[in-house]
């Protein structure tokens, strides 16, 4: 009876089969039509083009969905495909273990929407106000005095994957044997320049963020430390570490001042990832960038400004 799951069909053939399978299921015609379209499409993106390959291995199926250039990528659109698979398993396959696994992927896919609201992502009007091209921001950085706090701030949000307002109390360790006294720190020696972030918004999901400073960023940091030796990456006028809120407030004011228009750290993160996507960065690299920014690949798509 289940032979159809393991056979290869054209999209139209599989569409007809799925419509027939759902014929007597008490669901709306709209839902049935959606499943009959989305599931065959999704199967066509897989290395093994069968329904069984799709339903048995959600990780591979979702990776293929994320990689295909044939659809618009957003959590909302992915939800339609994942929901179709969940419905097929719930009503047709009726495998509780498989359903539980797919429901977990469905839940993860839905998180970016809630995360977007929690992050207070900019509105369309705010986007327009902060629509400074990435290259223009980089140009402004290079025009600022070497070693200045504003130049270093822009450097840490453009020359490395930009995190949230998590640099507020980032300790600088110049000896690898030193034990950090803060959750967030940079190990800066003659042979190593490593950022470690343990206190950040999504730490329960991602545990920690680790990143290696680029050569250009190392030069920016060294110039700043030569000009103002200190224990922390960014400090107040009396050389103390910022609180998260005070750092965010200072950073937004500093960015707005030097860029001569409204700018926030969130907007800068949007501009960074939009630039990467516009540069046709590979899906694999985009996933790595998302991890270093402390969020999911789907959340990264929310960050893209068209």
Q: PLM features: residue spans?
A:
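Basic, Lys/Arg- and aromatic-enriched nucleic-acid-binding interface segment
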Residues: 130-166
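Conserved tyrosine-mediated DNA breakage-rejoining catalytic core shared by Y-recombinases
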Residues: 170-215
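A short, glycine-centered helix-capping/turn motif at helix boundaries
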Residues: 147, 156-181, 279-283, 293-295
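Short, polar N-cap/turn motifs at the start of nucleic acid-interacting alpha helices
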Residues: 261-262, 282-305
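Non-catalytic DNA-binding core/recognition domains of DNA-processing enzymes
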Residues: 23-105, 266, 270
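Flexible interdomain linker/hinge and immediately adjacent N-terminus
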Residues: 97-140
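Active-site/catalytic core of tyrosine-dependent DNA strand-transfer enzymes
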Residues: 210-268, 272, 277
């Amino acid at each position: 009876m289940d032979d159809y799951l393991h056979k290869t069909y054209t999209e139209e053939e599989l569409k007809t089969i799925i419509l027939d399978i759902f014929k007597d299921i008490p669901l709306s015609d709209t839902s049935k039509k959606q499943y009959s379209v989305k599931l065959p499409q999704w199967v066509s993106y897989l290395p093994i083009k069968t329904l069984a390959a799709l339903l048995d291995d959600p990780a591979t199926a979702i990776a293929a969905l994320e990689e295909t250039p044939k659809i618009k990528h957003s959590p909302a659109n992915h939800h339609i495909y994942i929901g179709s698979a969940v419905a097929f398993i719930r009503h047709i396959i009726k495998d509780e273990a498989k359903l539980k696994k797919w429901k977990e992927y469905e839940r993860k896919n839905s998180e970016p929407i809630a995360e977007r609201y929690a992050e207070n992502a900019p509105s369309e009007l705010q986007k327009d106000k902060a629509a400074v091209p990435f290259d223009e921001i980089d140009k402004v950085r290079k025009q600022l005095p070497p070693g200045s706090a504003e130049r270093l701030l822009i450097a840490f949000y453009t020359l490395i994957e930009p995190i949230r307002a998590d640099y507020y109390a980032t300790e600088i360790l110049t000896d690898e044997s030193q034990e950090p006294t803060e959750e967030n720190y940079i190990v800066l020696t003659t042979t190593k320049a490593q950022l470690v972030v343990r206190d950040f918004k999504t730490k329960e999901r991602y545990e920690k963020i680790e990143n290696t400073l680029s050569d250009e960023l190392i030069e920016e940091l060294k110039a700043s430390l030569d000009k103002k030796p200190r224990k922390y990456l960014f400090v107040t006028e009396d050389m103390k570490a910022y609180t998260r809120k005070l750092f965010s407030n200072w950073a937004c004011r500093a960015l707005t001042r030097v860029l001569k228009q409204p700018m926030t750290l969130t907007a800068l993160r949007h501009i960074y990832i939009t630039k990467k996507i516009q540069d046709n960065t590979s899906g694999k690299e985009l996933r790595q960038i998302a991890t270093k920014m402390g969020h999911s690949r789907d959340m990264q798509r929310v960050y893209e400004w068209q």
